[in-house]
Swiss-Prot record:
Similarity comment text for this entry: Belongs to the dethiobiotin synthetase family.
GO cellular component: cytosol
Role: Catalyzes a mechanistically unusual reaction, the ATP-dependent insertion of CO2 between the N7 and N8 nitrogen atoms of 7,8-diaminopelargonic acid (DAPA, also called 7,8-diammoniononanoate) to form a ureido ring.
Any single GO BP term: biotin biosynthetic process
Protein name from the UniProt record: ATP-dependent dethiobiotin synthetase BioD
Gene3D superfamilies for the chain: P-loop containing nucleotide triphosphate hydrolases (3.40.50.300)
Pathway named in the protein's UniProt entry: Cofactor biosynthesis; biotin biosynthesis; biotin from 7,8-diaminononanoate: step 1/2
Organism field: Lysinibacillus sphaericus (strain C3-41)
Residues engaged in binding substrate: T41
Coiled-coil regions, chain positions: none
Residues involved in ATP binding: D12, V13, G14, K15, T16, I17, D54, E115, G116, A117, G118
EC annotation from Swiss-Prot or TrEMBL: 6.3.3.3
Annotated NCBIfam families: bioD
Length: 234
């Protein structure tokens, strides 16, 4: 199997949903998977209990016991861009440390799914000289791109694809998240695939996050691309 990133055209496009879904689908095949969120922001307080939504979702739906120390690099309380959230706490994000963590995880698990934060160009330092995209390039790992199906997604997706391809980052496929089946959404999907005929999967709009457990994408060309890269299947 291949280690990879899950990245998005923007914040809140469904990267965590897709990361969790791919984690579960691959776990069902008997693979040892670790989802890794290099940087997460926005601590949530609930009845004297605090947590972060991304890693909490991994743990809730995982079919395997996850090592908490392996799931995250940095967590910051403020729900903001990583560089600003870190600044508020007087911290700096050590990119080399993140890359070393990713390398260690690759040597320890069948598949590492690294989930991005926000969009590709989100800055990681106050000088705004290092972005998430720089980390992806340095990691030398391919990506799965998550995008919306709604109005505006064509432009956002094509711009993101241009940024990835201009840096020779291998795009394994596209996940269209939140589909309601409207004619406009179907045309958006068709148009994007005309520009970039990649493996893909479509996830319907979820009325409740618990519906995630019922989604199956193992029949999609995207999943075939991911699992088909495993030499054990040949």
């Amino acid at each position: 199997m291949q280690h990879f990133w899950v990245v998005g055209t923007d914040t809140d496009v469904g990267k965590t949903i897709v990361t969790t879904l791919l984690m579960c689908q691959l776990q069902r095949l008997g693979l040892e998977i670790i989802p890794f969120k290099p940087v997460q922001t926005g601590e949530i307080y609930d009845n004297l209990h605090s947590y972060y939504a991304d890693t909490a979702m991994y743990e809730k739906y995982s079919l395997q016991v996850l090592n908490k120390e392996h799931m995250n690099g940095y967590s910051f309380k403020e729900a903001a861009s990583p560089h600003f959230a870190a600044q508020l706490e007087g911290q700096q994000i050590d990119v080399e440390n993140l890359l070393q963590r990713i390398q260690f995880l690759q040597e320890s698990y069948d598949v590492v799914i690294a989930e991005g934060a926000g969009g590709l160009f989100v800055p990681l330092d106050v000088q705004q000289s290092i972005t998430l995209l720089d980390v992806i390039v340095s990691s030398k790992l391919p990506v799965v791109l998550v995008t919306r199906t709604t109005l505006g997604t064509i432009n956002h997706t094509l711009l993101t694809m241009e940024a990835l391809q201009s840096r020779q980052i291998d795009v394994l496929g596209i996940v269209f998240n939140g589909d309601t089946g409207s004619m406009m959404e179907q045309d958006n999907i068709h148009t994007i695939l005309q520009y970039h005929p990649l493996p893909y999967a479509i996830i319907p709009r979820l009325q409740d996050i618990s519906e995630l457990a019922n989604i199956n994408i193992t029949h999609t060309t995207l999943f075939e691309r991911l699992y088909g890269n495993d030499p054990r299947n040949n």
